[in-house]
Amino acid sequence: MENNITLEEIQNFKGKYPKQLWYLFLVEMWERFCFYGMRGVLAFFMVDQLGLVEGKANLQYGAIQAFVYAFTFIGGIFADKILGFKKSLLFGGIVMILGNLLIAASPHDFFYYGITLSIIGTGFFKPNVSSMVGELYHENDGRRDAGYGLFYAGINIGGMLGGAIPIYLGKNYSWSLCFLSAAIVMIIGVITFLLTKKHLAPIGNSPLEKHEPKKRNLYEIAVYVGSFVVIPFVYIMVINSDFTEYFMYTMGIVALLYFAYELIMLKDGKQQRKLLAAFVFIFGYFMFMAISEQSGGSLSLFAKDNLSNKLLFFHIDPNVVNNSINSLYVVIFSPLVGLLWIFMAKRKIEPNTVIKFGLSFVLLAAGFFIFYTARFFVNQDGLSSLDVFALGYLVYTLGELCIGPIGMSVITKLSPKRLFGMMMGLWFLSSAFGQFAAGKLGAEISDANTGTTLMSKLIAYTDGYYQLAVYSLVAGIALIVLTPLIRRLMQEVK
């Protein structure tokens, strides 16, 4: 049973946050535990347990992550046109649970089969929670950014726990327990959604509600069946990363054509300019992800072999630090950065959204430069300081905080309501291309190591991080220079 509450009543909430945001916060938190838990073990597991060389593992990692995010674009379209956000989320969550349970049954035998299910499930789940958050607010509600800030904190609490617990269980107990933990928290997330979705009332309902039930059910069943029909094809592409390029290029062309079609169909100059501005942010996010998403690939492998296990006065697994410290920093510093923007806004000196995007690249460059300096803190065994590594992540995270919480918010501000799902899908698709590019960059970093010692690996990897710092700095400066042009496209949107 759905509550009789109307959309207008939801959007006219009192206070800072609507209660529905807290429910979506919890659902997303558990799903992010599952996602980041898997992400944090991918490259490590493939090298340590499946015996892949590091360059190949980076490519495989990039391919898997690319498929995950590419399918969010497809899932967003099906949610927009047929299923609605609620049914899409529920279906995706169940498929993700099945994928993790399959791997947990026999990690070495069923790894790629389970990953295939997780890719499809995440595609249906991921874009929908953030889209429903956007619908909790009126178009010009100034509380929207604060809502996405809280939602972003939920993502990172899940990411922090997911980054630390599964890899710890896998390395110290069993890999079956590692993947089982991801399945268990996903079950909690799905149950949470089932118990609270009535409070969302019309938000996320099927766009085909007014169609006759028989016709609507036929469309929905076709989506579900089609999702399982493509499993063999996705599996083949996952185990053969050479196919990834063909898939990504095809997906990119289709996505651009579909975006162009929807842009033309708007037939409203103001809306078209706003949608073009949204596309600029989406492309910027692609560049950011291509550089920053080394954390699950090359940085994970760097932490595996080239970092000491001492952080300040504590002993801790470097891979636990690599997988979770970024999310920990986000939880700690996200509200502080939010307060900084408020402080600056009161004094009318807050940078606009485009400048914030540019600053994110500058800080990302500084973070990777600190990773590069790890070579100056190395001992005779080729182990560098975990403290320096953690400092690099702190600066890197401050850059992320300039783009992450406001990114999804600005996309929903610039997009017509009927295109929310597609534009959030494009946002995640840009991440898919970023993940794909990150895998290639990580593979180049690994392949540059022609030696056999930990010291030669450290030199090769830190050289790569220096190059990434340069790329990021150039991108940041370019965005800042182009700010006036992009602001004109955005019109009244801040």
What does each model-found stretch correspond to?
Residues M1-K19, E139, G170-S300, K304-K310, ...:
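Intracellular loop-helix junctions on the cytosolic face of multi-pass helical membrane proteins
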Residues M38-N58, S295-N322:
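Short amphipathic helix-loop junctions that connect adjacent transmembrane helices
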Residues G62-A79, K126, S324-V337:
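Central cavity-lining transmembrane alpha-helices of secondary-active solute carriers
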Residues V68, R143-G163, G170-K171, A183-G189, ...:
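Glycine-rich segments within core transmembrane alpha-helices of 12-TM secondary carriers
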Residues K81-G93, Q271, F343-V362:
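Cytoplasmic membrane-interface "Motif A"-like loop-to-helix N-cap segments
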Residues F91-Y112, G358-D381:
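C-terminal ends and interior cores of transmembrane alpha-helices
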Residues G99, F110-F125, I282, Q380-C402:
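Hydrophobic core of transmembrane alpha-helices in multi-pass small-molecule transporters
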Residues F124-H138, C402-S415:
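Intracellular juxtamembrane helix-capping segments at the cytosolic ends
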